[in-house]
């Protein structure tokens, strides 16, 4: 059985490129979520964030592990911004599908806060998942097709998120 995760953390190209490579991630697609416009598109996505939908095998990878990479590859302390990308489209958000994901998201954020790995306070939103509008084909797997394309996401070397008991 598979599970679904929906995240937003800046431009969806870089998020998808790194998350899709995790063992246990079966499928990813980029799109628009967390906002107010039905049938969102790149040119008209209102208050939606650029997001990624992840289908994963929980026997091979945990939701927590996906969130650990999420917090490693984007800056969760900058509101409505990732690198040079500025605006609500680029906010940090976790859209949970059930109470278990909500709990894990809140615990992981608390671990990030306690770890000191990021210099500021985490501003990642935690909200229930709503509609996910798939982005246009040219945005899907963008960096797989254009390996030298734009991204502001990268794994930080030696970045390991401890649980609070180990971080304190």
Curated annotation (Swiss-Prot):
Q: Name one GO biological process term.
A: protein modification process
Enzyme class, UniProt record, top EC level: oxidoreductase
Note whether GTP-binding occurs among the keywords. Answer: no
Disulfide bridge positions per record: none
Instruction: Please list the reactions this protein catalyses.
Output: L-methionyl-[protein] + [thioredoxin]-disulfide + H2O = L-methionyl-(S)-S-oxide-[protein] + [thioredoxin]-dithiol; [thioredoxin]-disulfide + L-methionine + H2O = L-methionine (S)-S-oxide + [thioredoxin]-dithiol
Q: Which domain of life is it from?
A: Bacteria
GO terms of molecular function: L-methionine:thioredoxin-disulfide S-oxidoreductase activity; peptide-methionine (S)-S-oxide reductase activity
The UniProt keyword set, sorted, is:
Oxidoreductase, Plasmid
Give the Gene3D superfamilies listed for this entry. Peptide methionine sulphoxide reductase MsrA
Pfam families assigned to the protein according to its UniProt record, in alphabetical order:
PMSR (PF01625)
Task: Give EC number(s), comma-separated.
Answer: 1.8.4.11
Q: Where is the active site?
A: 11
What HAMAP family is this protein classified in?
Answer: MsrA
Q: What does this protein do?
A: Has an important function as a repair enzyme for proteins that have been inactivated by oxidation. Catalyzes the reversible oxidation-reduction of methionine sulfoxide in proteins to methionine.
**Which family does the record assign?**
Belongs to the MsrA Met sulfoxide reductase family.
Name of the protein described by the UniProt record: Peptide methionine sulfoxide reductase MsrA 3
Q: Which organism's genome codes for this protein? A: Rhizobium meliloti (strain 1021) (Ensifer meliloti)
Q: What is the lineage of its organism?
A: Bacteria, Pseudomonadati, Pseudomonadota, Alphaproteobacteria, Hyphomicrobiales
Q: Which gene encodes it?
A: msrA3
């Amino acid at each position: 059985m598979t599970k679904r995760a929906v995240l937003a953390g800046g431009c969806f190209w870089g998020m998808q490129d790194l998350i899709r490579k995790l063992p246990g991630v079966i499928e990813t697609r980029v799109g628009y979520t967390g906002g107010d416009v039905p049938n969102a598109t790149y040119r008209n996505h209102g208050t939606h964030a650029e997001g990624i939908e992840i289908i994963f095998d929980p026997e091979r990878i945990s939701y927590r592990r996906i969130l650990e990479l999420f917090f490693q590859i984007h800056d969760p302390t900058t509101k409505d911004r990732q690198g040079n990308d500025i605006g609500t489209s680029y906010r940090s958000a976790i859209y949970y599908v059930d109470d278990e994901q909500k709990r894990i998201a809140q615990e992981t954020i608390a671990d990030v806060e306690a770890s000191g790995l990021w210099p500021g306070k985490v501003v990642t939103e935690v909200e229930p998942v709503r509609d996910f509008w798939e982005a246009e084909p040219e945005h899907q797997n963008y960096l797989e097709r254009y390996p030298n394309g734009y991204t502001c996401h990268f794994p930080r070397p030696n970045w390991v998120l401890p649980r609070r008991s180990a971080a304190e």
